[in-house]
Amino acid sequence: MKTSAALLFLVSLASAAPMTPSPAAEAAAVLEGRQIQTLCDQYGYWSGNGYYVNNNMWGKDSGSGSQCTYIDSSSANHVSWRSTWQWSGGQNNVKSYPYSGRTIQRGRTIASINSMPSVVQWNYNNGNIRANVAYDLFTSTDPNRDNTHGDYELMVWLGRYGDVQPIGSQIGNANVGGRNWQLWSGLNNGMRVYSFVTTQGAITYFNADIKQFFTYLQQSQGFPASQQYLTTFQFGTEPFTGGQTTFQVNSFGANVQ
């Protein structure tokens, strides 16, 4: 997880040379009250109003860089946040997945869910990067499984920057929700990962029922919807490499009905 919100920085005029602040310096320079909370720790976490945000630099040791995430506003209907990062090295390794998530009631199988409406608006202020922008949902036969793994993972790539690609290989094409997608499939430590990748460029405004993707997998790939419990419902970005950039989520809203 975007039209950019203006960032106000304290700029020193003592030197004529322009300086680009690191994410940590940016956090200190943002005027007090500009955001609800700043997250610069590896797994910095915030929650409120049925949503949560995680800085989630899980792969940071595969390269070098920095990242901070800022929660700008939240309500019962949405959360607004942004993440500023810069990463180098480990060309083909994901460095992080800063994300927003919807707090869900555990114990519901995919088959028992009628719909999963979600609306998101986002953008990147620098396209010269290698990263994706994607929904990420886990399911498991254990309704109480932790939210870092599952039996199945569903990713919906709304943005693809550079030569990055999903886990596995492309197994076909799909039309879901009136849009065309590449369908990829692969294994990640025993977890089956299905990725729907946009074929129409970045989708910066997306309003859809995510349940439709599970229905497609049930019908075409034999996904066991009656045996799999939903454990996460998240949206964010996976940076690989790139100079300092800001991923802005103007609004992320989701529900499980």
UniProtKB/Swiss-Prot annotation:
Presence of the UniProt keyword Hydrolase in the record: yes
Induction (record text): Levels of expression are constitutively high during infection and spore formation.
One of the Pfam families matching this protein, by short name: Glyco_hydro_12
UniProt cross-references to InterPro entries, sorted A to Z: ConA-like_dom_sf (IPR013320), GH11/12 (IPR013319), GH12 (IPR002594)
Gene3D superfamilies named among the record's database cross-references: 2.60.120.180
Keywords of this entry: Carbohydrate metabolism, Cellulose degradation, Glycosidase, Hydrolase, Polysaccharide degradation, Secreted, Signal
The organism's place on the tree of life at top rank: Eukaryota
pH dependence, entry free text: Optimum pH is 6.0-7.5.
The protein's Enzyme Commission number: 3.2.1.4
The keyword Ribosomal protein is annotated on this UniProt entry: no
Signal sequence range: 1-16
Compartment(s) of residence: Secreted
Temperature dependence of activity: Optimum temperature is 30-50 degrees Celsius.
MF terms (GO), sorted A to Z: cellulase activity
One of the GO BP terms on file: cellulose catabolic process
Primary location class: secreted
Record's GO cellular component terms: extracellular region
Chemical reaction(s) catalysed: Endohydrolysis of (1->4)-beta-D-glucosidic linkages in cellulose, lichenin and cereal beta-D-glucans
Leftover remarks: The biological conversion of cellulose to glucose generally requires three types of hydrolytic enzymes: (1) Endoglucanases which cut internal beta-1,4-glucosidic bonds; (2) Exocellobiohydrolases that cut the disaccharide cellobiose from the non-reducing end of the cellulose polymer chain; (3) Beta-1,4-glucosidases which hydrolyze the cellobiose and other short cello-oligosaccharides to glucose.
Stated family: Belongs to the glycosyl hydrolase 12 (cellulase H) family.
Function (record text): Endoglucanase that functions in part to hydrolyze 1,3-1,4-beta-glucan during infection and spore formation. Shows preferential hydrolysis of barley beta-glucan and lichenan.
Protein name (Swiss-Prot/TrEMBL): Endoglucanase cel12A
Protein source organism: Pyricularia oryzae (strain 70-15 / ATCC MYA-4617 / FGSC 8958) (Rice blast fungus)
Gene: cel12A
